């Protein structure tokens, strides 16, 4: 089970590592204005991927019952939304503690959260849990 679980984590980790390389090595977010938009959308997809497969594993293990498509959708949607909020909190704390300028405005903050949630919605709308459970 853990091997399968780690395989579900590989996509989100790859997205995060890609983000780190773009930020720390290439300073790409300052050079390519639209990169932030695409990465938040991709981050929402990655989070939804991990959450979806985690819910399926919890269902198979009889820890959580998510056989209803509505229950599955609401769980994934709610957890993706919570994850985007937590990510933005982390950015705020980084800005505050290290005097960085990651969150340039409230508009940017809301756009980032919106794009993460939309990415999650796109993933969950195309995902078929009935084929997995």
Regions found by a protein language model. Give the residues of each.
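Hydrophobic faces of alpha-helical transmembrane segments in multi-pass integral membrane proteins
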Residues: 14, 43, 47, 51, ...
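Membrane-interfacial alpha-helical segments at the cytosolic side of multi-pass membrane proteins
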Residues: 42-60, 96-101, 117-130
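Residue-level signature of transmembrane alpha-helical entry/exit and packing/kink sites
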Residues: 8, 37, 68-76, 108, ...
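"…centered on the first transmembrane helix and the immediately adjacent amphipathic helix/loop
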Residues: 1-53
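Interfacial helix-loop-helix junctions of multi-pass membrane proteins
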Residues: 26-36, 84-117, 121
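Internal alpha-helical transmembrane segments of multi-pass membrane proteins
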Residues: 57-81
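Small-polar-interrupted transmembrane alpha-helices in polytopic inner-membrane proteins
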Residues: 10-23, 72-94
């Amino acid at each position: 089970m853990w091997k399968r679980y780690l395989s579900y984590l590989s996509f989100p980790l790859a997205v995060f590592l890609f983000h780190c390389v773009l930020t720390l090595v290439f300073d790409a977010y300052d050079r390519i204005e639209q990169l932030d938009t695409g990465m938040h959308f991709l981050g929402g997809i990655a989070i939804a991927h991990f959450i979806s497969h985690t819910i399926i594993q919890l269902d198979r293990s009889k820890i959580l019952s998510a056989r209803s498509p509505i229950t599955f959708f609401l769980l994934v949607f709610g957890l993706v939304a919570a994850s985007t909020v937590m990510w933005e909190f982390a950015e705020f704390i980084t800005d505050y503690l290290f005097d960085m300028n990651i969150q340039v405005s409230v508009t940017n903050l809301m756009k980032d959260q919106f794009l993460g949630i939309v990415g999650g919605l796109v993933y969950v709308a195309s995902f078929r849990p009935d084929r997995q459970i």
